[in-house]
């Protein structure tokens, strides 16, 4: 853990509350996938590189991680994507990681050879909820299967199927963001994009993967420890002024705005009930993970 933390740019005041639970969760998922030394992995939607650090730690000196993302260099807070990547490059794990700003089709085209000759697997580490719509997820799996011929895909994402009643608050926050993103005008991602965009559920993601020719060889679910606060932060965002301002500035139809505000009102109602019961933080949704392989 210390090797990973020392390779990450973060606020030391948030080490215990935020970063240790975050990396502990990512290590748990990567171990469930079965990441082993020597692997060459393409990490799609790598963001600021936290997933790359975990994967680089597990693949060792003989492995390598290539992280790609379309995010603007200025995206991210309190540290931007550019600041985070620059820090990682100079760290102990930096030699095992390559960062590139690119979409998947462009990256694969620029390889000038089949991706299967360069990478033995692809990772989608909490990145699919960031995709703008369901078609983009279907297109991704088709690209991975046909163009890249990627033999193995590791994926994980939040599950809307709650196992604990107290996870309902996070689910409502995610669904409210997804609803807004469905109605907003299509445009290129900006510096302040929300985390939940298309927010596809497990069945839709697996339908896209299977339609492209992938099969599930191993899967499971993880209920995060209460110290894992991603869901809590999502609720804070949706209930905050920034989200409301974005809804108002989008010039939606009256019906669309009313639907979003009704979803937000339901979120606040359930969250207030949760707080009256004596709880200060929100329980995170379960995470489902899978290992997919191409072919029969």
Curated annotation (Swiss-Prot):
Per the record, the pathway is: Mycotoxin biosynthesis
Q: Which gene encodes it?
A: ustM
Q: Where is this region: Methyltransferase domain?
A: 37-142
Q: Which UniProt keywords apply?
A: Methyltransferase, S-adenosyl-L-methionine, Transferase
The name of this protein is: Methyltransferase ustM
Q: What does this protein do?
A: Methyltransferase; part of the gene cluster that mediates the biosynthesis of the secondary metabolite ustiloxin B, an antimitotic tetrapeptide. First, ustA is processed by the subtilisin-like endoprotease Kex2 that is outside the ustiloxin B gene cluster, at the C-terminal side of Arg-Lys, after transfer to Golgi apparatus through the endoplasmic reticulum (ER). Cleavage by KEX2 generates 16 peptides YAIG-I to YAIG-XVI.
Where does this protein come from, organism-wise? Aspergillus flavus (strain ATCC 200026 / FGSC A1120 / IAM 13836 / NRRL 3357 / JCM 12722 / SRRC 167)
**Which BP terms does GO give this entry?**
methylation
The EC designation for this entry is 2.1.1.-
For this UniProt entry, the molecular function terms from Gene Ontology, in alphabetical order, are:
methyltransferase activity
Q: Which Gene3D superfamilies match?
A: Vaccinia Virus protein VP39
Question: Per the similarity annotation, which family is this?
Answer: Belongs to the class I-like SAM-binding methyltransferase superfamily. Erg6/SMT family.
Please give the SUPFAM superfamilies that the UniProt record associates with this protein: S-adenosyl-L-methionine-dependent methyltransferases
Q: Which CDD domains match?
A: AdoMet_MTases
Phenotype of null mutants: Impairs the production of ustiloxin B but accumulates intermediates such as ustiloxin F and C.
One Pfam family name is: Methyltransf_31
Which InterPro entries does this one have? Methyltranfer_dom (IPR025714), SAM-dependent_MTases_sf (IPR029063)
